[in-house]
């Protein structure tokens, strides 16, 4: 990888407009994208990358999955409305022929990328004390001080547990909404392979 290009991507690709930074906008900075960007800069700017990784951990839900997008300006304001479920909201309420939800309203891959990002940080720095640091989980409408907290290690465990609890009949992770590829919107119950 080209360190300069990775640095530019991390700093600019998600921060170009108030549309992505803004307060409770319909968009925001992508969880998956940001986690991937951080892995590209971890070797030469691990402490700066860690700050964004902590922001990402703070928009992980107590169930273990993560909000698909968050707005950094709203996160700084701590208004309880700094993250959203991304495009999965478009399919909310769509029912199949049996009257059941046709699509997942959660993303099944976002929360797994932060596991890789934190692992990269630990490999680069050896600072295992990070695993003990407490970070709140995301609960819409609540300020950070009111939210459940967990160690970084607990966040990572819940990430893996969420995937483990969403397995299909063939032992493969169920696909959430737009998992691994923003254009994939398979019916609820589809398995990764």
Indicate where each model-derived feature is located.
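Low-complexity, Ser/Thr/Pro/Gly-enriched N-terminal "stalk/linker" regions
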Residues: 1-25, 51, 55, 162, ...
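N-terminal, helix-rich and Lys/Arg-enriched segments in bacterial and organellar proteins
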Residues: 3, 12-14, 40, 68-73, ...
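Active-site-adjacent structural elements in folded domains
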Residues: 16-26, 98-101, 178-193
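Aromatic-rich carbohydrate-recognition surfaces in CAZymes
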Residues: 29-34, 38-173
């Amino acid at each position: 990888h080209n360190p300069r290009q990775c640095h530019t991507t991390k700093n600019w690709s998600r921060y170009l407009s108030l549309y992505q930074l803004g307060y409770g906008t319909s968009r925001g900075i992508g969880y998956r994208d940001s986690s991937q960007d951080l892995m590209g800069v971890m070797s030469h700017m691990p402490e700066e990358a860690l700050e964004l990784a902590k922001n990402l951990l703070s928009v992980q839900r107590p169930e273990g999955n993560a909000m698909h997008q968050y707005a950094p300006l709203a996160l700084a304001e701590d208004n309880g409305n700094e993250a959203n479920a991304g495009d999965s909201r478009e399919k909310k309420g769509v029912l199949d022929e049996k009257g059941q939800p046709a699509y997942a309203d959660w993303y099944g891959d976002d929360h797994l990328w932060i596991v890789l990002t934190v692992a990269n940080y630990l490999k680069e720095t050896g600072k295992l004390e990070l695993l003990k640091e407490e970070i709140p989980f995301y609960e819409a409408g609540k300020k950070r001080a009111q939210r459940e907290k967990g160690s970084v290690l607990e966040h990572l465990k819940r990430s893996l547990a969420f995937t483990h609890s969403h397995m299909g009949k063939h032992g493969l992770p169920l696909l959430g909404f737009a998992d691994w590829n923003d254009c994939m919107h398979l019916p609820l119950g589809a398995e990764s392979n």
